[in-house]
Each structure stands twice: as structure tokens, then as C-alpha cells.
């Protein structure tokens, strides 16, 4: 509860600066560390081929077994790597690095890669997206320890990219929803990874699919959002993706057709959350954070009054989302810190 109070007091400053102080970052580090090796409760999301697949989460996934589920564990690790990189001299960075060094072993990460090779649809594509985002951050941590971790992590990146390259040509339609299966968010993350690593073949495939799925979309039905357990805005994720695909002029024209008259309707106001302890209803906290970061990303590709429309709405959503990030309930705290750090440190922008 102490952390919640501290963050609530600082919300206004976070919005004004759109950045984290070392102290604030330390609160998110503590939150991420608290779930890093927390094996239970756990939702392993496994497909059982044989009786031998019945194992504990740690046996199944020797690195990413904490934080309730695989993808949350991945972005919990990402949170630590990103904050260690942004605040290398922070007192808490020593503890965070030590925890990561215990987890990022060559043997453990190879087992993670082997699992992804065996179960090719596991965490498709939401978990894949976060795993590649972690890869971007590891590559950017340009010191001896970071290079060691990045080298050990390479097999995970390689199999995810191989799985994506095999899957995407067969995916004929986008998946439009407000939670894990949605396609616009992972396509955006994968484009960022392909550009960070220079994988032009992968980038070309991703842009082709983004154009195929979304180029012709018009008059997005904003009145249909949100659904009751969304943590994504399908419409804003799509718009945030397409700024990565189009030139600035083409993007503005497309966006004006996608959101006619740049009227955001329901998307302009934060959503309320009735129960922060309910694992599905608390998704709506993540929705507020997701709306805020996508709106900021979209605003970065616009000018003048149109830019202001998105920035004003983003501020409202940021305040609402940060207020509920530290709830004291593991239902939200096992994952919401990563969404907040993604927003507050300007990822993808």
C-alpha cells in the first residue's frame, strides 16, 4: 500500500515529465523482483502431448516461470533490463542485475527456446512480441553483462522469428480483440525488433501483413470499445502500428479516415475498474495504460490540433492507469508494472 500511495502522489509529475525518476523506477523494480521467482499461483498455458508434459512451472520453463504466466514473466524481466539500462548507477540496479544474472543462463534460455520449437503456437503472438521486445532491450544494454545475456538469449529470438515467419504468411485475417490474440500490437513490436536488428526480410513480411490487414480500414467503430475485460484497444493498437508502416503524410490521411474528423468518441475517456482483485476486470487498468501509450505514439506522427487531441486524451488515461497500477493485489501487480514502464519510458516512440 505504501508503494501505491507514493505512486499516486507522483502521478501529476509523471504526466508532466513523461519520464521516471530513479526513485520511481525503483518502485517498479521492486514490483518486478517480487514476482520474478514466484512460481505459484501460475497459469502455465501448456498443451499436453504426453503424460511427461505434466510438470511444475519451473520444470517446464526454467527462466520464465514466475509472474503468474509466461508472457508476464518475460515482460517482468524486460522491465528490469530496461530500468537497469536507463538507471545504471541506481543503488537498486545491483540487486536487479544479480537477479537477472541468476535467470539469464545459457542452459535455461536454451530450454526456453527448445520449448518454443516444440510447441510452435505457444504464446503466439502476444508472448512472442514481448520476448522480442526483451531482445531489443538486451541488445541495447551495451556492457559486458548485457552482451553475455544477449548472447544467451539469442536462441529464444531466433526460434520466435522463425515461428513468426512460418505463421504469418498463413494468417489471412487480422485478429481484432482487446486481449492476447490481437495482431496489431505484436506486429508493431516485431517491426521494432526487425529494425533494431536489421532483419530486412522479416521487416518486409511484417509490413506486407500490416498493409494487408489494415490499410483499407475506415471509420473504426469506437462506440464498440471497451469490452469488459480488455487490456488493449484494438483500434488504437492498429493506429499505433500503422504509424510505423506509412510515411507521415500518408499516415495522417489514413488516420483521418480511420477516425473520421479525428473524433475518438469512447476512446477519449478513461474506463472505470470495478474490482482490482478480479484477474479479468483488472485488465481495464492495463487498457488505460495501453490507450495512453498508443495515443502518445500516434500524437508523435501528427501536428497541431490533431496532435493535441491525442495528447490530452493520453494524459487522462495515464493518470487513471497509474492510479491503479499498485493495487496490492497480485491479479494486477504481476503484469501492470510493465505496462506502466512501457508508457512512462517512451518505448516504441
Language-model features: locations:
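C-terminal hydrophobic structural anchor segments
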Residues: 278-325
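Extended ligand-binding groove/face enriched in aromatic
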Residues: 59, 74, 83-197
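Solvent-exposed loop and edge beta-strand segments that line ligand/cofactor-binding
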Residues: 17-22, 57-74, 113-129, 170-183, ...
Amino acid at each position: 500500500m505504501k508503494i501505491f500511495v507514493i505512486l499516486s502522489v507522483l502521478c501529476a509529475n509523471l504526466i508532466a515529465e513523461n519520464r521516471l525518476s530513479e526513485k520511481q523506477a525503483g518502485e517498479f523494480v521492486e514490483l518486478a523482483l517480487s514476482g520474478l521467482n514466484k512460481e505459484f499461483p501460475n497459469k502455465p498455458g501448456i498443451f499436453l502431448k504426453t503424460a511427461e508434459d505434466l510438470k511444475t512451472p519451473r520444470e517446464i520453463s526454467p527462466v520464465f516461470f514466475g509472474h503468474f504466466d509466461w508472457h508476464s514473466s518475460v515482460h517482468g524481466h524486460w522491465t528490469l533490463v530496461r530500468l537497469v539500462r536507463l538507471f545504471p548507477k541506481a543503488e537498486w540496479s545491483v540487486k536487479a542485475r544479480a537477479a537477472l544474472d541468476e535467470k539469464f543462463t545459457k542452459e535455461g534460455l536454451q530450454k526456453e527456446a527448445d520449448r518454443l520449437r516444440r510447441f510452435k503456437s505457444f504464446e503466439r503472438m502476444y508472448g512472442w512480441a514481448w520476448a522480442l521486445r526483451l531482445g531489443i532491450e538486451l541488445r541495447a544494454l551495451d556492457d559486458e553483462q548485457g552482451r553475455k545475456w544477449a548472447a544467451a538469449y539469442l536462441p529464444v529470438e531466433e526460434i520466435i522469428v522463425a515461428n513468426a515467419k512460418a505463421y504469418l504468411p498463413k494468417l489471412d485475417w487480422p485478429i481484432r480483440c482487446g486481449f492476447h490474440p490481437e495482431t496489431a500490437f505484436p506486429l508493431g513490436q516485431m517491426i521494432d525488433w526487425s529494425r533494431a536488428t536489421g532483419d530486412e526480410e522479416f521487416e518486409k513480411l511484417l509490413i506486407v501483413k500490416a498493409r494487408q490487414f489494415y490499410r483499407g480500414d475506415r471509420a473504426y467503430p469506437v462506440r464498440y470499445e471497451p469490452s469488459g475485460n480488455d487490456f488493449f484497444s484494438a483500434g488504437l493498437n492498429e493506429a499505433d502500428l500503422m504509424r510505423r508502416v506509412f510515411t507521415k503524410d500518408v499516415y495522417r490521411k489514413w488516420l483521418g479516415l480511420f477516425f473520421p474528423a479525428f473524433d475518438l468518441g469512447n476512446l477519449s475517456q478513461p474506463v472505470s475498474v470495478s474490482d482490482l482483485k478480479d484477474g479479468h476486470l483488472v485488465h481495464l487498468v492495463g487498457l488505460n495504460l495501453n490507450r495512453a501509450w498508443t495515443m502518445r505514439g500516434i500524437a508523435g506522427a501528427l501536428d497541431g490540433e490533431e496532435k493535441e487531441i491525442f495528447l490530452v486524451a493520453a494524459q487522462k488515461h495515464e493518470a487513471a492507469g497509474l492510479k491503479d497500477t499498485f493495487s496490492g493485489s497480485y491479479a494486477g501487480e504481476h503484469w501492470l508494472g510493465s505496462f506502466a514502464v512501457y508508457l512512462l519510458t517512451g518505448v516504441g516512440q
